Amino acid sequence: MAKINKKVMNNYLKPKLMNSDEDGVRVKVYISGHMIGAGKMELFNLVNKHGSINKAAKTMGMSFSRANMLLDTIQMAFDKPVLTKGSGNKGTQLTKFGLQLLEKYINLCNHLTSESKNFIRWAQSNQ
C-alpha cells in the first residue's frame, strides 16, 4: 500500500467514504463535468490498499470490467495519470498525483462530515 499521511488515514477509517449510516454526508465532486464520488473513491482507495484492481473489485462485489470502467472515469477528469501498472504489468498502484487526489478527497470528506454534525443534530431535533 502506498503511503498516505497516517493522521488522514486514521481519520478516514471513521467515517468511510461510502456512508452506510442513514445520517451523514456523501460527497460528489464534479471536475470538468466528470463526477467523482464516494463509491469511485472507495474503489480507488481499495486499489491503493490491495495494489490490485481485481482485489479491489472483489472487495466491493463488482466485476473487474466495471471497476476498470469506474477508475477510467476518474482518470478522464485529469491530464495527469492517477494509476500505474506494476512491473511486468502485474498489480496497480496509485501515482503520486493519485495519492494526492485520494488524500485531498479523504480530507474533504472528513471536514464535511465533521461540519455536518451540528446541522444533522439540529435537523433531527426538528423532525
Feature map (PLM): residue ranges:
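Alpha-helical residues within the helix-turn-helix
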Residues: 58
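Short, Lys/Arg-enriched N-terminal segment that forms or immediately precedes the first helix
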Residues: 18-32
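C-terminal flanking helix
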Residues: 75-79
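Basic, amphipathic "hinge/linker" alpha-helix immediately C-terminal to the N-terminal HTH DNA-binding motif
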Residues: 85-107
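Central "turn" residue of the DNA-binding helix-turn-helix
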Residues: 61-63
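Residues within the DNA-recognition helix of helix-turn-helix
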Residues: 70
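Helix-turn-helix/homeodomain-like alpha-helical modules used for DNA recognition
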Residues: 101-127
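Short helix-boundary/capping micro-motifs
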Residues: 47-55
